[in-house]
Structures are given as structure tokens and as C-alpha cells.
């Protein structure tokens, strides 16, 4: 592009915010013009995040001072409840918005209000938002003014299911179980006793068994692709003693005669960020660390009619900031891979 895309980031002091800054610094078509934080206004980005010394000369500003309306696109890397109040004004001024919070993901307003415990401030805008699972909604994302970036668990679980659901390969009335593990960074950067090293290190636990906010988001995607499946969906998240990474083990029943690996390979043939591994493989979280990748394998359980899907992502990249940049690329007609060609870190 001859003219660079002017980008603003609201709430840039969290883990998804710094991940956006890291990825966008390597993007050839982007100028990060504004970064906001009410609590750190006036602090240089490079002082707050030493990893970005020599990369950014910007300082954090309050949203009112940052001139966000002069940006081409604004990312909201904010807690739930912020974007729904501030995004409408920017959209009215012609600014495109990608919201990394959950404010616009769930289309049914009462369902959203039940799970997030607040009244939605912009219910009329929810129907205009495009759900930004890039590999599912490319065409709609390209035309969107507002993209609801998916959650990390929904991304990790939905990507292996989408091709099978689109071809109605799952058996209705049978259980569909997602057993998921996340690194501690998924809890965010705020103070939380459960995220302390002495609590999360050398420990492994399930949480949200009675209900997790990502459950209705995943069910919404499933229900939109194949009838009779979402009702049997069970989702149990776990906290693993690692910083970043996400692993989903999904147990499902397929219709007779299905060749799921071929279905997955055909669907993702032109998707640079989804890697279908050979039968018998077991993807590892370290194989996607720092990269905008989802690696998937599928095989039938021994002496059983149950199929086992394994899916891994970096929760901060493909599960958040990387997918947001991928959506931005689609919105501006760029190659999806621009700024996202980082090789995973190993070890």
C-alpha cells in the first residue's frame, strides 16, 4: 500500500494490547498512531514495556486526547463493557473497529447480559457486528465496519469443527465434548490471586464447570452451521501451569462414511494459518508459541466410534491479537499474512 493504515489501540497496557503492539511493529502497511490508557497516560510505551524499547516513540494518552477519530481503524483491547460505550462514536465518524473484548460477539442480547452481568449499552450495533473467526467469515469481515474478535477458547474449539459442521458430518443428539487447557495469560494482566506464580505454578485445575462465558459463544457458532448439535455441547476449561498456549481435546461422533481429515484439509487448503497434521499426530502448544497458527489433528479413538480432535493455538496470538491483525488485513484488502509471518518460538 502507498498510504499506511493509521491504527489506534484502546487499552494497550494488557497482554493483548502489548501483543498488538508487537505484531503491528512488524507490519509493513501500518502506522500505530495512538495508544491509550487512562491509568498510564503520559508514560512512554517503551518505558512501560521494555521489550518495545527502540521500537515505539509513543506515549500512552487518555482516549479523549488520543485523536482516535483520525485513525483508519481502532482496536479495543479493553475489559468487557468499554467498547460498547466508546465504539459507536468512532464508527459514526467512519473509523473501523475491531473489538477484542466480548461486547459484540453474542447476537442474543439477553444471553449476553446474563453471562456478562451488565446491560448492553449498544444493542442496536450488535446485529451489525461481524464475528471475526477469519476462516469462517472472510467475505463478511472484508465489508465490516465492526468486527467482534472471537475469544481464545472459541477459536481453538471452533476451527476444527467448522468444516465438519458445514458439511453436517456430526451426529445429532450425541454429546460433543470440548476439554480445554489454557495458559495463565488468558486470565489477563490484572491482579488475581489465582494467577500468582505460587498459585498457578506446579498446579493444574478445572474452572467454570457450572458455566463459562465462552460457552454461549461456541454454541452460537455450532448452531449457525448444523442443527441438533449445540444442545449436546459440553465445555470444560482448565488452567495449565504455562504462560501462553491453549489446547483443546474435542470428542465427537461423526456420521457413517465420513473422512474427517480430508474434509479439514479441503476446507483449509487456502488458509495460511491453519495446519492440518497427519493422522496420528498430536499438536503441541509450543509448536505455535508466538505465532498466528492453529494446528489440528483428528483420529478415531481405539475400539470406539468416538473421534478425537486435537487443536492448539497461542491464546494471545491466534486467540486474540494475531487474529485481530488478520481481520484487519482482510478488511483493508491486504494479504492475510502481512505482519503475521513470525515463526513459533522454540524452546
Swiss-Prot record:
A Pfam family reported for this protein in Swiss-Prot or TrEMBL: Semialdhyde_dh
GO cellular component: cytoplasm
Keyword Amino-acid biosynthesis among UniProt keywords: yes
Keyword set, alphabetical order: Amino-acid biosynthesis, Arginine biosynthesis, Cytoplasm, NADP, Oxidoreductase
Chief location of this protein within or outside the cell: cytoplasm
Localization (cell): Cytoplasm
EC numbers for this chain: 1.2.1.38
Pathway in which this enzyme or protein is active: Amino-acid biosynthesis; L-arginine biosynthesis; N(2)-acetyl-L-ornithine from L-glutamate: step 3/4
Reactions catalysed, as given in the entry: N-acetyl-L-glutamate 5-semialdehyde + phosphate + NADP(+) = N-acetyl-L-glutamyl 5-phosphate + NADPH + H(+)
UniProt-annotated catalytic positions: 152
GO biological process: L-arginine biosynthetic process
GO function terms (MF aspect): N-acetyl-gamma-glutamyl-phosphate reductase activity; NAD binding; NADP+ binding
SMART domains, sorted: Semialdhyde_dh
Similarity comment text for this entry: Belongs to the NAGSA dehydrogenase family. Type 1 subfamily.
Function, as annotated: Catalyzes the NADPH-dependent reduction of N-acetyl-5-glutamyl phosphate to yield N-acetyl-L-glutamate 5-semialdehyde.
The protein, known as: N-acetyl-gamma-glutamyl-phosphate reductase
Lineage of the species this protein comes from: Bacteria, Pseudomonadati, Pseudomonadota, Betaproteobacteria, Neisseriales
Gene: argC
Amino acid at each position: 500500500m502507498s498510504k499506511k493504515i493509521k491504527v489506534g489501540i484502546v487499552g494497550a497496557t494488557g497482554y493483548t494490547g502489548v501483543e498488538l503492539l508487537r505484531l503491528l511493529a512488524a507490519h509493513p502497511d501500518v502506522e500505530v498512531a495512538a495508544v491509550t490508557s487512562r491509568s498510564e497516560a503520559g508514560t512512554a510505551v517503551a518505558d512501560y514495556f521494555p521489550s518495545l524499547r527502540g521500537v515505539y516513540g509513543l506515549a500512552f494518552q487518555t482516549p479523549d486526547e488520543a485523536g482516535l477519530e483520525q485513525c483508519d481503524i481502532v482496536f479495543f483491547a479493553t475489559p468487557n463493557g468499554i467498547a460498547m460505550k466508546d465504539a459507536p462514536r468512532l464508527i459514526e465518524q467512519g473509523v473501523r473497529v475491531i473489538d477484542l473484548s466480548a461486547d459484540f460477539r453474542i447476537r442474543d442480547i439477553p444471553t449476553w447480559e446474563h453471562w456478562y452481568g451488565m446491560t448492553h449499552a449498544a444493542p442496536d450495533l450488535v446485529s451489525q457486528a461481524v464475528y471475526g473467526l477469519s476462516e469462517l467469515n472472510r467475505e463478511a469481515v472484508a465489508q465490516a465496519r465492526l468486527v467482534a474478535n472471537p475469544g481464545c477458547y472459541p477459536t481453538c474449539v471452533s476451527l476444527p469443527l467448522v468444516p465438519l459442521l458445514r458439511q453436517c458430518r456430526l451426529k445429532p443428539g450425541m454429546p460433543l465434548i470440548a476439554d480445554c487447557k489454557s495458559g495463565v495469560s488468558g486470565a489477563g494482566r490484572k491482579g488475581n490471586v489465582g494467577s500468582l506464580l505460587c498459585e498457578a505454578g506446579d498446579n493444574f485445575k478445572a474452572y467454570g464447570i457450572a458455566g463459562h462465558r465462552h460457552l454461549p459463544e461456541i454454541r452460537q457458532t455450532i448452531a449457525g452451521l448444523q442443527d441438533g448439535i449445540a444442545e449436546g455441547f459440553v465445555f470444560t476449561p482448565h488452567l495449565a501451569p504455562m504462560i501462553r498456549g491453549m489446547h483443546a481435546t474435542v470428542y465427537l461422533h461423526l456420521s457413517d462414511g465420513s473422512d474427517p481429515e480430508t474434509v479439514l484439509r479441503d476446507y483449509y487448503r487456502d488458509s495460511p494459518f491453519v495446519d492440518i497434521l497427519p493422522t496420528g499426530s498430536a499438536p503441541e502448544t509450543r509448536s505455535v508459541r508466538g505465532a498466528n497458527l492453529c494446528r489440528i489433528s483428528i483420529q478415531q479413538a481405539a475400539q470406539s466410534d468416538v473421534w478425537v480432535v486435537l487443536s492448539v493455538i497461542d491464546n494471545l496470538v491466534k486467540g486474540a491479537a494475531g487474529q485481530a491483525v488478520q481481520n484487519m488485513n482482510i478488511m483493508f484488502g491486504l494479504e492475510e499474512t502481512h505482519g503475521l509471518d513470525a515463526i513459533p518460538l522454540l524452546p
